[in-house]
Swiss-Prot record:
Family: Belongs to the UPF0178 family.
Stretches that traverse the bilayer: none
Pfam family, one: DUF188
CDD domains (UniProt xref): PIN_YqxD-like
Name assigned to this protein: UPF0178 protein amb2838
Domain of life the protein comes from: Bacteria
InterPro entries, alphabetized: UPF0178 (IPR003791)
Length: 151
């Protein structure tokens, strides 16, 4: 059965995930390096990992299986999940796919290099109401896709 994993420390759409997961009866696991206040629901669990740059990512990549869904903005984690045949969705509602992940990794590496040499690159645009709406629609679609991967 499909499970949803949330890269939880900075995810702005946790409540939306809980709502969609509840509608479909899916288990949700939030992974982060600090306890978060979550709804009292037997289908929602929290895994707290030790502090470290990739501890939450490593745990999600270890647990995720084909047909599961990962909610993350982290491109390397998205790549690791795609390799395991999971589905990946960013909080802004844009999926990471096998076709898009290579470009996303290359852009990330380029931006890191530019920051290292002192070029100002700016950050992502602020999270907007339209992002939340797009996310809900995309997650609903992705749940149906996941059911086709693992019936």
């Amino acid at each position: 059965m499909t499970k949803i994993y949330i890269d939880g420390d900075a995810c702005p759409v946790k409540d939306e995930v809980f709502k969609v997961a509840g509608r479909y009866g899916l288990a949700v696991t939030v992974v982060g390096n600090a306890w978060l206040r979550l709804p009292q629901d037997p289908m929602i669990t929290m895994i707290v990992v030790p502090e470290g740059p990739d501890a939450a990512d490593d745990r999600i990549a270890e647990l995720i299986e084909p047909g599961d869904i990962c909610i993350t903005n982290d491109i390397p984690l998205g790549s690791r999940c795609l390799i395991k045949r999971a589905l990946v969705l960013r909080p802004n509602g844009k999926p990471m796919t096998e076709n898009s992940i290579g470009d996303a990794l290359a852009t990330r590496d380029l931006m890191n290099t530019l920051r290292e040499i002192g070029t100002m690159t700016g950050g992502p645009p602020p999270f907007a109401k339209a992002d939340r709406s797009r996310f809900l629609s995309a997650l609903d679609t992705m749940v149906h896709q996941a059911k086709r991967v693992v019936p």
